[in-house]
């Protein structure tokens, strides 16, 4: 059963943070790449700390071993300096898919007793 094996590693490009640059009076979109560097199929889901300001497309999916996906991270217009942006980040969560599961993302993979790994990517806003 896949759930008894801890999920392997993923890589993200960029690897440590996402940077948006001013002006913030229009929507910005930044692309990040998520790569499944493990030997098992994984399901991934992306969470944001500020759903009003930040969006991710596609927000979830399935990656085969060594497969990559390009995600569009969007930042809606906002009043820079007047809103708290200190804790903004996106979190990539991933888990092994069950053996024999279809290549269709299922939220319940994250709700059972299988191990879920997380990688945080802080958002930096340059004035």
From Swiss-Prot:
Keywords: Acetylation, Cell projection, Cytoplasm, Cytoskeleton. GO terms for cellular component: cytoplasm; cytoskeleton; pseudopodium. It comes from the Eukaryota. The keyword Metal-binding does not apply. It is found in: Cell projection, Pseudopodium; Cytoplasm, Cytoskeleton. The modification N-acetylalanine is found at residue 2. Residues 9-126 form the MSP domain. InterPro entries: Ig-like_fold, MSP_dom, Nematode_MSP, PapD-like_sf. Its main location: other. Sperm. Central component in molecular interactions underlying sperm crawling. Forms an extensive filament system that extends from sperm villipoda, along the leading edge of the pseudopod. PANTHER family: MAJOR SPERM PROTEIN, MSP DOMAIN-CONTAINING PROTEIN-RELATED. Around 30 MSP isoforms may exist in C.elegans. This is Major sperm protein 3. It comes from Caenorhabditis elegans.
